[in-house]
Amino acid sequence: MMSSPIPHQQTIAAVATAVAPGQGGIAVVRLSGPAAEVVGRSVVSIPGQQLWVSHRVLYGHVMDESGKERIDEVLVLLMKGPRSFTGEDVVEIHCHGGLMAVQRVLERVLAQPHVRRALPGEFSQRAVLNGRLDLTQAEAISELVAARSRRAAQLAMTGVDGGIQRRITSLRERLLDQLSELEARVDFEEDLPPLDGAELLLELQCVRRELEQLVEDAKRGDVLRQGLQVALVGRPNVGKSSLLNRLSRRERAIVTDLPGTTRDVLESEIVLEGVPITLVDTAGIRATQDALEQLGIDRSHQALAAADVAVLVFDLSLGWTADDAALLAQIPDDLPRLLVGNKADLQPASMAASLMVASLGNEVDGKTVDVMLSALTGQGEEALIKAVLKTCGASEAQGLVVALNQRQQDLAAAAAIALARTQEAAEHQLPWDFWTIDLRQAISSLGEITGEEITEAVLDRIFSRFCIGK
């Protein structure tokens, strides 16, 4: 990685804070590049004896092109490179939030010579190119911004603090040590003592196992990062909408005693034990002549196909019916599912239990109800939450320390595969130089994770997924 700022011909600018009409007390317009200070001095009028000193906040006004009209009252901060986020000269203009003030300030900045609008993720990309961040830290910042739960934010912060970088760099250095031993034997075997191939191979196997464990852990971490989609399915009037409202802690869906009340797919975003979950209340699935209701049923099938887990709700007071069995058969075999008996409050628990056993019998291939609950009273709610998290493997994600994103997972897996090929070369007693081929590939893959071995074209593709202003 480069440790001194890379010269960029253009200075970039963008709004670095979320902006919505009428929302937000303040917003930040960020500039980075060689003209940042000049542009800041041009658009911001600083009264009195205040001096433009690095890392000192100044008070002033953004003026229009004529210098007569005040566009906004602002605070401005100059950060001279390399002591800035990007490693370049950076100016941040803190103006009032909302829409119009921010837009006018940004337009005033972009009207200056040698300034253009920043591309998505371009500030972070410059930080990586200038050695202020490694690639895993930059990606972790993006994940921190997008985090939908406290646990996801904590996991992202570990990456921001360099947790992923340290882990990957340590593994890569261990491989580099082994590669240096091998290459020395290839070039100067006569001058060196014999190499213990078994010991070297054991070290490569240890690194491979650690990489495979990182990939396995990361798959569980995806649950915290991406969340789960849980589809509530069942016949009309079994209490799906009541269950959605219960879990959402608000009246998200209309609830009546009339079958077919829900005619579209309703969604509710919640967080359960640190896991972001999208609850999808589907229209009751049944045969119908109502075109509007049928449209809702079609969308229910689409929601089911996109779900991570299906919660099939049936009415305990009516028992398991042929329609329930038909719905169960429509759930894809590879989709995790839970059978949930609702309306347990309508009869004593002992009656509900006996009704469950008697009604299910062999009609569901020996499967029993996973949870009995009452969406009305909340009875069984905690059991349902635990069952959903366990079914999706989310419970196992709670203890993770670091979790690779998908790009990092793919590269770690590629490194592990390359090390497996190295082991095959050893088993076939191939010469040392055959070992080095795949070992170099593993080292290269790990270098791509941290950005030590990566092209700017690949960086462009990675950072294009970031938000503008980051």
From Swiss-Prot:
It is found in: Cytoplasm. PROSITE patterns: G_TRME. Its EC number is 3.6.-.-. Its main location: cytoplasm. Coiled coil: none annotated. Its cofactor is K(+). InterPro entries: G_TrmE (IPR031168), GTP-bd (IPR006073), GTP-bd_TrmE_N (IPR018948), GTPase_MnmE (IPR004520), MnmE_dom2 (IPR027368), MnmE_helical (IPR025867), P-loop_NTPase (IPR027417), Small_GTP-bd (IPR005225). Mg(2+) binds at residues 241, 262. Binds 1 potassium ion per subunit. Pfam families: MMR_HSR1, MnmE_helical, TrmE_N. This is tRNA modification GTPase MnmE. It comes from Prochlorococcus marinus (strain MIT 9313).
